[in-house]
């Protein structure tokens, strides 16, 4: 029954005075041993020739996360075993375009799935944290979908059908603990600094390009093409750096609080990242996004989950229960 303050004091600050040093397993409610992920644990469409390198980069990153939640990692290891989209003859593909998501189409006459597309980042760059968080987020969505109530249909995902988790989203809650609010403020300030710095570089590059155009050293079509390219690259760099800022994953924690607020937190500017009230009008989406964010953070940023646990212990308990229930269903 170690309190969060004692946990932080002992295992973050390194002060163990007056504490009985328990094993990690005892502290983490006797969770299973952390076992490494392997490529054969994933669905075939994530390990084929086209996707093998990307999935291996994800596996290598996750296996290096020593403090990852063993139960959540165990659930990701069941992804291949629980796959029921292509296994049921439904077309399924993986791509790396913009707008990361699990997209699907269905037949309106009977609600049956027509096809599914998993859109995830192509892992690249010096810091993969933000991209790994996004990939784990989307792959948790995929597992949530695998465990839908009727495998033939598109709806009834496991999280939104889970009574305990769903109960948290029947009413909105806009409360944010002081330490988390301070974290969000610092994150917003850092993202503003990143944005200002990259936009300043963009203005300089644009000015140089404009001078070349007026000097007639490049054509208008070349100018337009180059301008669109540097503008796109600046936008991508802002997103890349902000998602990695302050250790990465803070955007996911913000989205959990946005879901709890029904989207009003993002609408009001209390969080920088979130889906907003138009999206979260669908109560089921609040549970789905929260589980996906929890899954990613439990692997990459378990310290942020401990902050969430301190503020919303019953929510984290419900999320842990969802993970356990999905593991049981998968035979784990």
Q: What kind of feature is each model-predicted range?
A:
Residues 37-47:
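N-terminal low-complexity, Pro/Thr/Ser-rich intrinsically disordered segments
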